[in-house]
Amino acid sequence: IHLMNINFFIIIVLMIFFYIIANYYYLNLSKKIDLLKVSSEHKLHKDKVCNNGGIVFSTFFIFFFSLLYLSNNLTINWTNEIPRPYILFIVFIIFFLTALYDQFRGLHPVYRLIIQITLIFSALSTISFPLSNFIPTKIEYLLVLYFWVYIINCTNFIDGTDGMMSITNLNLYLNIIIFTYLTGNFTVAYDVSLILTPLTLVFLIFFNFPKAKMFIGDTGSIPMGYINGFLIFTLIAKGEYFFAFAIFSYPFLDVTVTLIKKTINGHLPWARLYDYYFLKPVIQ
């Protein structure tokens, strides 16, 4: 195991450089194509804002992640850590393409859920089971499937105001990096976090910091929710149960409490009522 070789560092620097350029190009493109813009919720922005920055974000993540993986420049040997790591890439791409279709053509929430369940079922092979000594493995499969889909939607739901999802994701990635250095317990979650941290920081500081010039949209929040679930269950597979829950506890609890209240009041779970706790200071 090595912390970071020079090739890894160079590739990350190039990724940051080209990502900034690509995002500014996409930002300028949105000024010419109205389809790429959206009206801000809660009237936080006077004019329409460039939407679906996830098109650039997700494309850069999968390209540079694949480059590092195929050139053997990641910090650890993935094939020794998880079964069939290529499945992670394939499912990510399908999530991205599905979100892209949904954004511009529309998918019924039920169909969207069916697709998510199907893709996560395929991605279960990227997690090392069993996760515990007291739950039957088949029950673990079912629980991971359910909660992984839930993490995807938690990530998507908190993408409701400037910088919120970016900050939440940064909390996840930075905690994993710091925890890895402190414990010396290197996992694939560390590699993913090293790549996503600079991408997310650039997006937050240059494009998404209030008031945002760009929203990441479903093309970013859905694939990133999938990756967040992978990171969390990778930590759980290493026995880090409390840590895995703690670093994602706020969005999990906010969304869970809000959905329970919404259901009790007779609303569908996916109804856009803007009643999450993180939105209340903004709306007020």
Protein language model features and the residues they cover:
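"…together with the soluble PPM/PP2C metallo-phosphatase catalytic core" -> "…together
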Residues: 5-256
